[in-house]
Amino acid sequence: MSEARRVAHANAGVCTAADLTAAGLTRRAIAAAVERRELERLRRGVFADPGVPPMIKQAVRVGGRLACVSAARLHGLRVLREPAELHVSVDAHATRLRHPDDRLRLLHPSGTSSGVRLHWTRGGGGRGPLVSLEECLVQMFSCLPGLDVLCALDAARERVDWMPERPQLLDDAAFARLLQRLSPAFRQLAHRSITGSQAVGETVARERLRATGVPVRAQVPLPGGYWADLLIGERLILDIEGEGPHTAPGAFDRDRARAGWLKAIGYAHVSFSHRQVLDDWESIDGVVRMLMRRRVHVWGDERSIGR
């Protein structure tokens, strides 16, 4: 790896001319690195490793940091809907912003005509080419519908008891700090997030059921060491397939074995695809309500000795 690329890597893929000269590179050496495509010039005095994600390059070219829902996936968050605009955090006093695809074109302060959504922030959202995880979430609260926010926040807080090797992106202390930055209404929304959701479909289904008064819990432990994606009432298991753990190698056979065991000890089980949850919720809602009218969600004579 060349010295120029090493400097870029040490700065999260994006560095300044000052970073490069501090490492001993002359102006001529910097120009040669650009010529050899070891570096890509984004703005005057700002360079990137060519392998940096395109959205980061665009945000830096604008004059800020990748922000909000545009930064969410790079932080490891789940996104309900892909953004139609490039979200960029810029300093409240920033001037001479540039077009995301052309460093020579000025950007109108609204940004909308160029497909950019500007987040004016004192300090521009921190250091590095994208805002911090906490700043990303704060921006999402003020910018996106509540369901979109919960999908991302569930992902940030996800803590899988049977997968301790998977790090929790936003631990309890960080969540408490996040709450302090939110308005009362947004704090109320944040408290609806959970640590057990493992997929967008689970979050969406949980919230849509909750909104209609259906008694639902997520990631509930079951007999035999199994878990329910969602448990309606006492015994109706609702699984969302095609996303999350249901797509892992061997998941099909494991899911069939699990379904057989749980049926044998008295649980009722229905499963729907991720696509159905997002695009055909009315059908799912109809099935759930018919089952609840039949009292399938509560224990009766089928209560098993495994309970």
Model-derived regions: residue spans:
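Surface segments flanking catalytic/ligand-binding clefts of nucleic-acid enzymes
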Residues: 157-307
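Short gly/ser-rich loop at a beta-strand->alpha-helix junction or flexible surface loop bordering the NTP-binding
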Residues: 1-184, 189, 293-307
